[in-house]
Amino acid sequence: MLNKFKISLIALTVALSSPALADFPNGYPSDYQKTVDGAKKEGKVVVYSTTDTKAAGPLIQGFEATYPGVKVEYNDMNSTELYNRYISEQAAGGTSGDVVWSSSMDTALKLATDYAAEYASPEQGQLPKWAVWKNKAYGTTYEPVVFIYNKRLIPAGDVPDSHEALAKLIASQTDKFKKKVTTYDIEKSGLGFMLSVQDFKADPDYFKRLADIAKGGLTVQSSTGTMMERVSSGENLIGFNILGSYAEARAKSDPTLGISYPKDYTLVLSRVSFITKDTANSNAAKLWLDYVLSEKGQSILANQADIPSIRNDIEGKNDIDGMTKMLGKALKPIPVDESLLEYLQQNKRLEYIKQWRTAAAK
């Protein structure tokens, strides 16, 4: 009896003195606990992101609850600011973000080309092949790009359901839409530039349609929030190239904001994430990336942050399967690959901006 007591006491002592086993998903590598233990020694992960802190809040809370002792230092900024800050810090050789998470897919991939660590996430088998680039950069979301409009001021019969319909509507009612249409300023917004280029690739008549839209005077902004606010207030009537995730979240509490998914083609954006090579918190960075891609993390994004999941096994309709059932063949995902880099070449970028400014009358 005494010996049994001693054995039990020893077992209890060992259990209490050993690190707690983390609650990571089944199917992860057998040595993944070493990554967890390493992350706890590092104590934090620094994330540079274009996803605002409020939207990312539930994800951060879920991560810190899953991995106690690993804090998330979350820095949100617009895509241009993120790119410039990261480049400057890397050039100076100082500390920077452990993880980059950006909606500007092209500039994120450009950064990944030079600065990403190679890491084969155990979650990559759950992702579409187009969302994984060289085990370095990962697409993390599945977000349709939409039109928004003011429900009070745009009759239901006038709501455009394609890019052609949008251009025809505005060109036929230039007085009504004079300075009432908004989109991104592609010179100030990295996301705006990338989406415009993707429109150009998808639509041979893109610049002609843009010129028709701009006949009444196009209002350009650098943020989605400003565009939604101005359409809701009536200062603008229609906005295009808006992230559907932000629009759907806003529309839940704003009955004035309408959303139209174009039926000719609907671009699908995927926020790109990568781990910085040689970063001080490499284990914590791996935990964060894996958590974002995991069923748990994706469920939080889809059902709490209103950001559609890139997986197809998430409860509810806010994932790839749900979007496919709603929009079918119109969906046009933007792949995470080298094609994103083409118009970041200086000569091509400048020439493209010149064409855009001519068509947009800017």
Regions found by a protein language model. Give the residues of each.
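Short, polar/charged alpha-helical segment
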Residues: 29-46, 50-71, 147
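Conserved C-terminal helix/tail region of periplasmic/extracytoplasmic solute-binding proteins
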Residues: 28, 332-362
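Bacterial N-terminal signal peptides that target proteins for export
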Residues: 1-9
